[in-house]
């Protein structure tokens, strides 16, 4: 991967994005936008939806667990931010406003396999399109290790076009740290769609800042 990406150029563009725009009263996130070309999204095999663990997460993600019984105990011991019981899930049925609010409140959700049919029915229609469906934790998997991984993770996926938008940093982080986060995301995209063939453009931008464009010819080593 390091042989494909021009790291010096990307780090300079990240520094430019950090300086661009007016100062704000809050710490802005830094987003990576990857625009691909020649990807036919009508083919299911061309879709991306995966988790990538960042080496320098801008902040710990908030995680909630749909849980009951032994899994509830394990989730509490793993330090999740909230427990949502089976009864609470059933109480959400038909309440689209409450489900949308819940989806916004947490970055990731976890659940045991036996709750997934209920969750698919109650929250699936709203969680699914938002990329918020729970990560299923099988009985033989350590819940704490899953939570620790999700604290540092971002979801890399396509929506309705071959574009990936991912938060890779925030103001206060160095361009080098943000670059290293960007590289792990680009590496995963490159596994599925070799960037030399599919990359059109990259962009870096702060929450309220202008996008800084990186053309493919600049982003890739010749």
From Swiss-Prot:
One of its GO terms (biological process) is translation. Gene3D superfamilies: 3.30.190.20, 3.40.50.790. Pfam families: Ribosomal_L1. The keyword Transcription regulation does not apply. One of its GO terms (cellular component) is large ribosomal subunit. One of its GO terms (molecular function) is rRNA binding. The keyword Manganese does not apply. Keywords: Repressor, Ribonucleoprotein, Ribosomal protein, RNA-binding, rRNA-binding, Translation regulation, tRNA-binding. PANTHER family: 54S RIBOSOMAL PROTEIN L1, MITOCHONDRIAL, LARGE RIBOSOMAL SUBUNIT PROTEIN UL1M. Belongs to the universal ribosomal protein uL1 family. Part of the 50S ribosomal subunit. Binds directly to 23S rRNA. Probably involved in E site tRNA release. This is Large ribosomal subunit protein uL1. It comes from Pyrobaculum aerophilum (strain ATCC 51768 / DSM 7523 / JCM 9630 / CIP 104966 / NBRC 100827 / IM2). The gene is rpl1.
């Amino acid at each position: 991967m390091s042989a494909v990406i021009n790291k010096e150029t990307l780090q300079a563009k990240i520094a430019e994005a950090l300086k661009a725009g007016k100062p704000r009263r809050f710490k802005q996130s830094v987003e990576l936008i990857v625009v691909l070309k020649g990807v036919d999204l009508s083919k299911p095999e061309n879709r991306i939806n995966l988790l990538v663990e960042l080496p320098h997460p801008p902040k710990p993600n908030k995680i909630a667990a749909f849980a009951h019984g032994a899994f509830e105990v394990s989730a509490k011991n793993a330090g999740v931010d909230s427990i949502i019981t089976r009864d609470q899930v059933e109480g959400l049925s038909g309440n689209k406003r409450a489900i949308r609010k819940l989806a916004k409140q947490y970055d990731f959700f976890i659940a045991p396999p036996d709750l997934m049919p209920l969750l698919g029915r109650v929250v699936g229609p709203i969680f699914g399109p938002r990329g918020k469906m729970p990560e299923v934790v099988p009985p033989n998997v350590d819940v704490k290790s899953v939570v620790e991984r999700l604290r540092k993770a971002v979801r890399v996926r396509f929506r309705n076009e071959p574009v990936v938008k991912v938060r890779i940093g925030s103001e206060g982080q160095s361009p080098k740290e943000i670059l290293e986060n960007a590289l792990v995301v680009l590496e995963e995209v490159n596994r599925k769609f070799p960037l030399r063939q599919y990359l059109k453009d990259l962009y870096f931008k702060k929450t309220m800042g202008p996008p800084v464009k990186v053309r493919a010819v600049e982003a890739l080593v010749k």
